[in-house]
Amino acid sequence: MKFRFWTYLTFILLLAFITSSCGPKLPSKRILFIGNSYTDLNGGLDTHLLGFAPNSESMRITPGGYTLKDHWQDANTLDAIRSGKWDVVVLQEQSQNSVTNYYNFFEYAQKLDAEIKKAGAETIMFMTWERPDSTQYGVTAEAVNKAYTALGQQLGVKVAPVELAFSMALQERPDLKLYIDDGHPTPEGTYLTACVFYGFIFQQSPVGNSYGGDVSKEDKDFLQAIAAKALGQ
């Protein structure tokens, strides 16, 4: 009898140890990214997000230079949305268009959002960052933030504050290269973006996640902390 008791107690303690060592269990999510090269570069944002949350499923539709209008007119994009396969659909507008052609941005975000909701998924807008080659056209961090915030309020959709995370990172470390001269992200920029989406979609701080992508350990820890700070985590 005593042997059975100790065997049972050992089993319970072992089970508790295994459970606690596994950490929090994240729900499985199916995520579709719709955008262009900003989402596609450095192996794809969907790929990096799965590095943070490997139990999920993700895919991207990202032809170069595409606007949301182009996606609306593309049967491949609409078929993917209407498949009903996704829990979350992320929309990324062409990096200048949200500011220089806001009404076009709004019109096609609204149309795509309606299809996404009809298919039973949630829309999340990908707030891009300031383009260094387009500030003369008004594509500044402040203007991009204002455009996406206004759209989010008008459509009642969530906006992932990637631009805010970029601004915060560069304020603390102006030496860190998050994008090249035409605005396309470096591996560090893509990694920071993935950190933001991981925290935003799963409501779980990226800090301490073992996935490091293609960045150094120092940059990994810094960018995870910045993303968490931008998300208030």
Regions found by a protein language model. Give the residues of each.
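Structural beta-sheet core signal
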Residues: 33, 125-127
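Serine-dependent acyl-ester chemistry module
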Residues: 88, 94-96, 100, 131-143
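Catalytic His-Asp segment of secreted/periplasmic serine-dependent ester chemistry enzymes
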Residues: 138-233
